[in-house]
């Protein structure tokens, strides 16, 4: 029964071509979809970038749909009404879901992420040519909304560049929920103690006086604050403590709106 159910599911959500109207008869649109209610914003960024690259390679105009399936960037009542992607990024090729609502040639993509070789995963750090390709793809199609760009530039100017010549070490730490769950085929960061030791080593080597820390995890934040009192900078205002097995998206969305939380995280990464 399980196998039959999966076959039905895969058939319903297969790649298929539809006609929604007669507009844009000379364009072929590819709607990028993904069903993943536990994946974070940057997981969607990586897989969407891969799907954009593949759609363009096949001669389509990519359009991202993060509206018609639940994801951690939307409140339950926003599903089907708000495209989460458009809150943070510009459309990759200028067209939104709303723009193509009456388009003639539309292909709906499968709801699973691209195969490993079609999206930027950690293997690219071992291949300079692949890294350069994904960097070029991101620069072309991954454009932040102007308001996010302004906040990034403002923080850098007011905080990081306040003292000319001062060196600040940038550090990103994934949450302990990621470390506890140990998702298959994902790289694991060192324990916080090892991160602290490496920070001390790099700060000494390069003469850094402060650390810009990007993390949503309260435990990691507390450990870093204790190790480097008065030296930690961060754009983020809130952090979260997860229990065993709890997803940090759920913990964060319980105290802050998904939009505000993910915008804050996106800006903090942009600053980094």
What function would you assign to each model-found segment?
Residues 207-272:
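Donor-binding and catalytic core of enzymes assembling or modifying cell-surface/extracellular glycoconjugates
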